[in-house]
């Protein structure tokens, strides 16, 4: 049954205009999003994209990570978030999400098309939680821009949330869209350390792209940011970028 005939498009219209959504509508939106992402996943598991898939897996996992066989493992959730939004395809340098949209926009349901358009506006964001509100929302701050955001509470609990750093793709306008969000333990000092290292990486990148902003760096090298966070969480005293590489 086409999703639009089930009234999903009207639900998405109402969500786009609403200040808040009910738990029931949130559940229906999650069903829509999961169905669409599964469809995209099947598309990219074809032989045509096997080289890209294996290349992306190597870039994401690095040389030391043991790749789990269980498809429900958090590793795979994080990988698909990276692959769809941040990886660049060999054939055209587009993100897989953008390529899927360009080649399938005439064949998907109208609601799926609108969700795709919103997902394409999502930005890789590193943030932390300031406090928990009493309406199932959390007040957050973007680590790099200091922008304040109100997001739904994570469904995995908020134990010691003041010492957690989170990152993933977020679209804040219209319907708040969050793909898989990764959380790692990080004190305030470690958060600042991570910020300093990533800004150093952006400075190195600007030797190649003179006018590159932090957003430009994230769009091109989000996997480097992911690895930097992982390295510093494990080995906080390591310099990821040598000071000798920086322009003085």
Residue ranges of predicted features:
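A short macromolecule-binding patch
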Residues: 147-152
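Short strand-connecting beta-turns/loops that link adjacent beta-strands
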Residues: 134-135, 145
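Surface loops and adjacent helix of pleckstrin homology
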Residues: 141-143, 154, 181
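Mixed-charge, low-complexity intrinsically disordered regions
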Residues: 1-126, 131, 158, 169-248
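Short nucleic-acid-contacting surface segments enriched for D/E, G, S/T with interspersed K/R
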Residues: 153-169
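Short aromatic-glycine-enriched beta-strand elements
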Residues: 136-140
């Amino acid at each position: 049954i086409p999703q639009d005939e089930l009234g999903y498009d009207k639900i998405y219209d109402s969500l786009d205009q609403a200040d808040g959504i009910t738990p029931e509508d949130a559940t229906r939106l999650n069903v829509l999003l999961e169905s669409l992402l599964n469809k995209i996943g099947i598309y990219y598991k074809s032989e045509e994209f096997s080289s890209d898939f294996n290349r992306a897996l190597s870039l994401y996992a690095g040389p030391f990570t043991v790749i789990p066989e269980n498809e429900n493992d958090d590793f795979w959730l994080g990988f698909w978030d990276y692959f769809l939004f941040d990886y660049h395809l060999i054939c055209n340098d587009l993100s897989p999400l953008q390529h899927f949209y360009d080649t399938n926009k005439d064949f998907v349901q109208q609601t799926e098309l609108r969700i795709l358009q919103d997902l394409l506006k999502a930005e890789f964001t590193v943030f932390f939680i300031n406090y928990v509100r009493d309406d199932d929302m959390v007040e957050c701050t973007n680590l790099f821009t200091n922008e304040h955001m109100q997001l739904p509470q994570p469904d995995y609990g908020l134990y010691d949330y003041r010492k957690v750093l989170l990152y993933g793709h977020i679209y804040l306008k219209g319907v708040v869209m969050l793909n898989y969000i990764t959380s790692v333990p990080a004190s305030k000092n470690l958060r600042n350390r991570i910020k300093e290292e990533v800004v150093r990486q952006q400075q190195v990148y600007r030797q190649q792209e003179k006018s590159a902003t932090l957003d430009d760096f994230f769009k091109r090298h989000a996997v480097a940011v992911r690895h930097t966070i992982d390295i510093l969480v494990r080995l906080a005293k390591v310099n990821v970028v040598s000071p000798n590489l920086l322009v003085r």
